A protein has these predicted regions:
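Compositional signal for N-terminal targeting/processing segments
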Residues: 1-240
Length: 240
């Protein structure tokens, strides 16, 4: 079984590995076994569209993104390039496959699907704002310095594989504590707040599917006497 905890007799949170074929099967099995009414998934609308629409961006398009000042996308592209090479993506599943499996399995069973993650643009802009200048330079330099790497993935692949975010979190927190806090700690609080809001809004059974790296943080927030409230969630959605 995947790592998980039961918040109550009607709320279960399971943790997954974003490139694990085992996670895909485990997610499907849990949805079939838990008899939930709502499946909450660690996706925002933007990431869901990216995973389902095969969005592409060629090098000319990437240059346009850079010129428009969308530095967080450059940060993501560069970090994903390094992580993909390190991990090899040899698990046989598309990154984010278990999240899509959760959505698809829920829809096939006519269950409600809730996308509970903060918008990826907000997360990346807040992370970029927290990074020190030399950290930004290092990331941009790595982007420019990968030209001779024959194993480097195409830009189109990188943008399709946005769900490597969870596997990057601990590494990034060491590299840049400020940015790591945004990607890990803030999103732990945000995801917990969204789960708590769903729990309070009805008596329905809820199964939440999140990256395993968020599981302990979410559980800690849900066990606190003062869980993230609506005002705090709104604060976490503010662009810098």
């Amino acid at each position: 079984e995947p790592p998980m905890f039961d918040r109550s007799d009607r709320v279960r949170v399971i943790g997954t590995a974003h490139i694990s074929s085992f996670s895909v099967a485990a997610v499907k099995a849990q949805i079939e076994a838990f008899q939930q009414d709502i499946v909450a998934v660690e996706l925002c609308a933007s990431r869901h569209r990216a995973l389902t629409s095969n969005r592409r961006l060629d090098k000319e398009g990437l240059l346009k993104v850079v010129k428009e000042g969308k530095a967080p996308l450059v940060m993501l592209q560069s970090l994903l390039a390094a992580e993909q090479r390190k991990m090899g993506l040899d698990e046989g599943e598309q990154p984010g496959a278990e999240l899509l499996a959760a959505v698809k399995t829920a829809e096939e069973a006519n269950l409600e699907v809730a996308l509970i993650d903060r918008d990826i643009q907000t997360t990346l802009r807040r992370a970029w704002k927290r990074m020190k200048f030399f950290e930004k330079v290092k990331i941009l330099w790595s982007l420019l310095g990968d030209d001779e790497d024959e194993d480097a993935p195409e830009v189109s692949q990188l943008l399709e594989d946005q769900d490597l975010l969870t596997s990057l979190m601990e590494e990034l927190k060491t590299f840049s504590p400020g940015a790591g806090a945004v990607l890990i700690d803030e999103r732990d609080a945000y995801l917990a707040g969204k789960i708590a809001a769903l729990e309070k809004s009805s008596d329905l059974r809820i199964l939440a599917v999140v990256g395993a790296g968020h599981l302990k943080g979410i559980e800690a927030h849900l066990n606190e006497s003062t869980q993230p409230q609506e005002a705090e969630l709104k604060e976490l959605e503010v662009l810098p």
